[in-house]
């Protein structure tokens, strides 16, 4: 039965890509079905470049992924059953499901498309209700050599950390990337200058939204430079105004995101730096431009073939609440993470990690009192194909 379903998918995708060729419904060497070919996906989740040119081969890639966890937090759940900064492992003192996702991707030398369906605590705590089942749904066409136009729903390309735990070193998401977009709705134009440099311009409905909230659009630019197969540098810029149309005072936002990934022997690490400004947004003077900044460093040491040790330090400062809104984090929040990962096979990962967050405001609730510190312990199991 499974073989028949897969064969049917090949026929359908071949039909839409054949453009009237009489023999296109017969699977041949020009058609390739791939199931679960990715094993090492760390740092891949937010890269701006995807499949670009596969020659005359029509490829269909099917994938599946399940991420389960148990988490303990020293603070209480106060946000619809989730802890403060809910993304990965957001439920306290219980087993949970981060993600269960199924994806299908099609690409050849002129057309490509991707649809990924999802379910779990990550979309439940962060996606708008009508769209919780959709992680990605977009299609693309090659306009000229090395120039692609894609449109639809995208997961975010901004930030070092992805919303999929398997694509990160840690099993938790930093406060930095929690306040960066998770998803976009719009269009991207991507040009691969050469094997090292890729440029992209994009237009979206807004900052972390599917449905437009005003008449303004978010505009962005990205540049990816692969120094070699071990070192990669990415710069993202985004400008938008989320002010409702009926408000006279506007708040134009400019967000700059720079990160690098490095894989040097047994050591892998990433560095991210962010800087943002927003007009008419200072708390003490609403006519002045406010700013925020953040940074993180994450690393992993492959101590043995199947065992890795990892850590992360993070810093986030948004005293004028450009991104945090009504939540007062004061001048800063910083944290440290330490964990151990065991990979019994290439597409399975077991991790245990400890994290501490320290804020200069008392934002965490512990029983009958407030605290400026949170301790976390997370156990995570990731399996994918």
Language-model region placement:
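Bacterial Sec-dependent N-terminal signal peptides
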Residues: 1-24
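Surface-exposed coil loops of outer-membrane beta-barrel proteins
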Residues: 7, 24, 34, 73-94, ...
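N-terminal periplasmic/intermembrane-space "pro-region" immediately following the signal or transit peptide
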Residues: 18-77
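Outer-membrane beta-barrel pore domains
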Residues: 33-36, 86-89, 123-127, 234-237, ...
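Outer-membrane beta-barrel channels and translocator barrels
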Residues: 55-57, 107-109, 144-146, 156, ...
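Hydrophobic, lipid-facing positions within transmembrane beta-strands of outer-membrane proteins
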Residues: 60, 97-102, 134-139, 183-187, ...
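Surface-exposed extracellular loop regions of Gram-negative outer-membrane beta-barrel proteins
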Residues: 100-121, 190-194, 198-200, 259-277, ...
């Amino acid at each position: 039965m499974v073989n028949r379903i897969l064969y049917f998918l090949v026929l359908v995708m071949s039909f839409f890509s054949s453009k009237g060729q009489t023999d296109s419904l017969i699977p041949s060497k020009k058609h390739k079905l791939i199931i679960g070919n990715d094993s090492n996906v760390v740092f891949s989740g937010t890269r701006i470049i995807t499949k670009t040119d596969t020659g005359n081969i029509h490829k269909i890639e099917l994938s599946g992924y399940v991420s389960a966890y148990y988490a303990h937090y020293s603070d209480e759940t106060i946000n619809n059953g989730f802890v403060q900064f809910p993304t990965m492992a957001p439920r306290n003192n219980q087993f949970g499901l981060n993600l269960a996702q199924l994806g299908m991707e099609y690409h050849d030398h002129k057309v490509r498309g991707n649809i990924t369906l999802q379910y779990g605590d990550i979309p439940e705590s962060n996606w708008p209700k009508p769209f919780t089942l959709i992680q990605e749904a977009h299609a693309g066409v090659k306009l000229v050599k090395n120039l692609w136009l894609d449109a639809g729903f995208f997961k975010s390309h901004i930030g070092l950390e992805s919303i999929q735990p398997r694509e990160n070193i840690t099993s938790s998401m930093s406060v930095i990337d929690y306040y960066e977009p998770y998803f976009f709705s719009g269009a991207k134009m991507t040009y691969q200058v050469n094997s090292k440099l890729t440029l992209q311009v994009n237009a979206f409905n807004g900052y972390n939204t599917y449905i437009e909230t005003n008449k303004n659009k978010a505009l962005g630019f990205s540049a990816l430079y692969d120094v070699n197969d071990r070192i990669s540098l990415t710069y993202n810029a985004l400008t938008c105004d989320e002010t409702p149309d009926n408000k006279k005072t506007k708040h134009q936002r400019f967000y700059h995101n720079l990160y690098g990934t490095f894989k040097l022997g047994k050591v892998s690490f990433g560095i991210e730096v962010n800087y943002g400004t927003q007009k008419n947004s200072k708390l003490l003077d609403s006519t002045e431009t406010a700013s925020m900044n953040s940074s993180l460093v994450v690393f992993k040491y492959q101590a043995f073939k199947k065992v890795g040790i990892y850590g992360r330090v993070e810093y986030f400062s948004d005293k004028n609440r450009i991104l945090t809104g009504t939540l007062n984090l004061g001048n800063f929040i910083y944290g440290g993470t330490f964990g151990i990962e065991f990979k019994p096979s290439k597409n399975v990962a077991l991790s245990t990690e400890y994290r501490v967050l320290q804020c200069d405001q008392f934002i965490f609730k512990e029983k009958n009192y407030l605290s400026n510190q949170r301790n976390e312990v997370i156990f995570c199991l990731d399996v994918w194909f």
